[in-house]
Curated annotation (Swiss-Prot):
Gene: tmk
Name of the protein in question: Thymidylate kinase
Catalytic activity of the protein: dTMP + ATP = dTDP + ADP
Chain sites annotated for binding ATP: G7, I8, D9, G10, A11, G12, K13, S14
GO biological process, one term: dTTP biosynthetic process
Gene3D superfamilies linked to this entry: P-loop containing nucleotide triphosphate hydrolases
Any one GO CC term of the record: cytosol
Role: Phosphorylation of dTMP to form dTDP in both de novo and salvage pathways of dTTP synthesis.
Keyword Cytoplasm: no
Keyword set includes Nucleotide-binding: yes
Length: 215
């Protein structure tokens, strides 16, 4: 089973992934947690390039770097793990590319979708949890975590984090459009709820989905 978590930076994905992985392992399941970009030696090196604040990367270059990282991760790690029956939990997948590079950077969606199809080989998540929080609130969380002032030119921010509020508003609206296109795959959760409330929703949803598959 492939489970993905999506949402703008600061939504709380990493926390929920850790809790879900621990929950599933406690039930005796084999679980692999991964992040995008990353997960292989090549992909982690691409991640460093993408997030380095001194790099000035064009939107198309950014898209292709993310896609190269994804192609490596899918073929080298995700597909083999799924074949062995491992539950894979992924922090971001191609929906992030659609939201960030498509809606955020303005890349033509048909072109973007072709590149996504090539990099994933058609692999899709079984379920995607979207942690919904307004960009303004998410960014306040993010800056608070780093204990830095709310300023996008701060040297402690990575290249993506320096993109600005208008960019994140476009990304947020992009996610809303994506979910409307595939409502059966997405589970939208209010990210302003407590960590435990969100976790309970996630585990309950997965339990119900698995019960539905077995019936």
């Amino acid at each position: 089973m492939l489970i993905t978590f999506e949402g703008i930076d600061g939504a709380g994905k990493s926390t929920q992934i850790r809790k879900l992985a621990a929950h599933l392992r406690s039930q005796g399941q084999e679980v692999l947690t991964l992040r995008e970009p990353g997960g292989t030696e090549v992909a982690e090196n691409i991640r460093l390039i993408l997030l380095e604040s001194r790099h000035d990367i064009t939107p198309v270059g950014e898209l292709l770097l993310f896609s190269a990282s994804r192609a490596e991760l899918v073929n080298e790690v995700i597909r083999p793990a799924l074949k062995e029956g491992t539950t894979v939990i992924l922090d971001r997948f191609f929906d992030s590319t659609t939201a960030y590079q498509g809606y955020g950077r303005g890349i033509d969606l048909p072109t973007l979708n072709s590149i996504i199809a090539l990099s994933t080989g058609g692999l899709k998540p079984d379920i995607t949890f979207y942690l919904d929080i307004l960009p303004e609130e998410a960014l306040i969380r993010k800056f608070s975590e780093k204990s830095i002032p709310l300023a996008f030119d701060n040297d402690e921010l990575d290249r993506m984090e320096r993109s600005g509020l208008d960019f994140y508003r476009k990304v947020y609206e992009g996610y809303r459009c994506i979910m409307q296109e595939e409502p059966d795959r997405f589970v939208s959760i209010n990210a302003r709820k407590s960590i435990q409330e969100i976790h309970t929703t996630v585990t309950k949803t997965l339990k119900e989905q698995r019960a539905g598959r077995q019936s």
